[in-house]
Amino acid sequence: MVQKVSDKQLIYYFSKKDIYLFAYHIGDLDDFFFHNCTWYGLFDNDQLTELILLFSGLSTPTLLVFGFSKISMLLDEIIDDLPDRFYCHYTKGLEKNFLSKYEMDYFGTHLKMKYQGLPKELRVKKFSNCTQLTEKQTGEILTFYEKSYPNTYFESFMLKTGKYYGIIENNLIKSIAGVHVYSKKYNIAVLGNIATDLSSRGLGYATTCVITLLQSLEAEIKHIGLNVKVDNIAALKLYQKTGFVPHLEYEEAFFKKKQYF
């Protein structure tokens, strides 16, 4: 049986089966994000066996399709309820479920990574040039991302988390590290929207911002993850240097409903 799910405890205990695979699911249970979520569940003898999340808090919705042996069945059951266009994170092979109704723009294979802790020499290192960013700087931050990371998932409400750090030189933002998900209640965070201005790359600014962000998160959060494209070698080196290890691979794409005339 397929039905929408709103029971936070049920969703949480299901998602704990693989905390880093379902990191967004867990973090989005926080009241800060939950009102933007639609959860589709597959039940077998009243037991939740599969779960798909549609997050509508961004300009373009994002669908998260990860699961187990019956996830394809659940996806087929809900496909007529999905938006006309959305980003999708999914297990390899599930793209075929969309192709009869949607056009696909494939973004490639990505890697989920999990945090094991900063190396000892970085745990207490401080960077005077890296500061916390606030909502007062929204305009400058949006301008920075438009130039440096136009495909970012950043929305200004994310600054309310207090987990965005940046380097500013001559009144211009040069680098930012932030979060996609952050919940003290559910003890989880997912790093994201990490970028550096083209003119400042190779100077270690992203590393500085990521370390500063992790130092802040370590005091509050037990489980920290991130997503990165598998062929982004520079980013992979940065994350490995700052305490992340691979967890599993998945795919990303943009889907747009086919138009028939």
Q: Where do the protein language model's features map onto the residues?
A:
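Acyl-donor-binding surface of acyltransferase catalytic domains
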Residues: 55-125, 253
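Conserved beta-strand-loop-alpha-helix junction that forms the acyl-donor binding cleft
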Residues: 89-96, 226-236, 252-261
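Conserved donor-binding loop and adjoining core beta-sheet/short helix segment
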Residues: 26-79, 177-192
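Short amphipathic alpha-helix that is part of the acyltransferase structural core
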Residues: 1-23, 117-152
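Conserved active-site alpha-helix within GNAT-family acetyltransferase domains
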Residues: 93-107, 207, 230-248
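A mid-sequence, solvent-exposed acidic-amphipathic segment
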Residues: 135-190, 195
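Conserved acetyl-CoA-binding loop-helix of GNAT-fold acetyltransferases
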Residues: 69-81, 196, 202-218, 236-241
